[in-house]
Regions:
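Enzyme catalytic cores with a strong preference for nitrogen-chemistry domains
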Residues: 1-202
């Protein structure tokens, strides 16, 4: 599986249009430990990987069985030779037109002190969150509150995307809930449970 992930990332970077900057989720082995990561790709290169910090270990989620927390990578940049890139938890990236963004993953937003808090203090204008948050009664509304409150607290844009219907199983249902918020206001949100590909902009 890990070899297939590496091959897929290398293929994606080669086939992706140069003008697109993409962030995708991937499990990565780093120095003998497995991390749940967001991988940044642009112009035929894998720019970096950001590991998830807060791992849920309750209810239906038991991530600590498989993954290590990225907290140990707070200030360290560690090379991933196969991908010719590195991993660093507190990385801030900058687009060609000067927009600075940071990344956190799913449960990081639910934490008492999300990584996005310090990322915004250090200059991130937009936070991207790659998530796999399942559907339960009223959970959509709870996510809306978390996202709007964090974007208000950090005075930044917040882009949240979750796993879609095709990633559901007999145990968990995912709706593909996606939200774009700015400084406390939700400015775009999808309906969820969409079966076709779509593009959401704001």
């Amino acid at each position: 599986l890990l070899d297939d992930v590496t091959d897929a990332l290398l293929a994606l970077k080669d086939e992706m249009p140069e003008e697109i900057l993409a962030v995708v989720g991937a499990p990565l082995e780093i120095e003998g430990a497995l991390y749940n990561c967001a991988v940044v790709l642009h112009k035929g290169e894998i720019i970096s990987a950001v590991p998830k910090t807060f791992l849920p270990n309750n209810g239906e989620f038991y991530e600590k069985r498989w993954f290590q927390s990225g907290d140990a990578r707070r200030d360290a940049s560690v090379a991933i030779p196969k991908l010719k890139t590195d991993v660093c938890r507190q990385a801030i990236f900058e687009t060609e037109d000067g927009v600075r963004f940071g990344i956190e993953l799913c449960e990081d937003l639910w934490a008492p002190l999300p990584p996005s808090t310090m990322l915004s203090v250090e200059g991130a204008e937009i936070i991207l969150n790659l998530s796999a948050s399942n559907e339960l009664l009223s959970k959509r509304e709870y996510r809306q509150q978390l996202i709007s409150q964090q974007s208000a607290r950090c005075q930044c844009g917040y882009v949240y995307v979750s796993a879609g219907m095709g990633e559901s199983s007999s145990d968990l249902v995912f709706s593909g809930h996606s939200v774009i918020a700015s400084c406390g206001t939700i400015i775009k949100e999808n309906e969820g449970y969409l079966s076709d590909d779509y593009l959401m902009t704001a």
